[in-house]
Amino acid sequence: MKYIHILLVFIILSLFITVIKSNYYDNNNQNQNQYSYHHTYNNNNQGNYQSKNVHSESEQNSYNKETRNNNDDDDDDENFERNKKSIRSRYHGYTYRNDQIQSRGNSAKGGSYSESTYFTLHSGTDRYGRRNDYSRFQTRGRSNGYRENMFLNVFDVVGNIKTTRNKRKITKSEKNGRYIKKDHMNNRDSNTNINEKPEYSKSPVFQGGYRSLEKNFTTNYGNSSNASIPLSGKQSQL
């Protein structure tokens, strides 16, 4: 019962911190959202695609056509005009800085690779906060693919416990390594236990059930100049 109460306290605290975080972002980051790619201004229904001097779609189309016609001959002038009088705001949602595209604001559609979500139960992401294509959650944060600095929730705790258990499991190769490291008679030059038999009793390396001490046998069988087992008569004739 004590662990159940502790679990409930974790869940309540996670939800409480989530509400605080979401309210903080909603109240203090509106200026960040206004430059988002999908944001639409409320003032005179001016969209994010419109320039400052154009107030209707027809004027916008004519402005774009005129700009293209006037600058067809000179690519440098065309790029200069597009940068100077862009159909988007200069501070739009994807700003080029240091040859990298930085996404500002939030985007519920494709193009946002940020990891933080507003919810503890983020069914649109995996347990690390990485979004799926069908996610419609509002997201914030850096674009490294993992949820960071958000809050401690029960799912992360359970996941860490499971990961720790998996690390404690011994793989097959590790078991073989432990077997080799044990003080077995096959890894020793002699054995004090008379009743213990070698694993490979017919091996020419062993004499009387134990490793031979008369010759300096090696284990480098791949090198013919350092072969440990003498060739038989038939093999030497070949």
Curated annotation (Swiss-Prot):
Annotated Polar residues bias: 97-106
Descriptive protein name: Female-specific protein 800
Protein role: FS800 is likely to have some function in the production or maintenance of the schistosome egg.
Region listing for Disordered, in residue ranges: 35-112, 166-204
Other comment: The two FS800 proteins are read from two overlapping reading frames.
Bias (Basic and acidic residues): 171-187
Alphabetized InterPro entries for the sequence: TES (IPR012615)
Organism: Schistosoma mansoni
Compositional bias (Low complexity): 35-50
Recorded superkingdom: Eukaryota
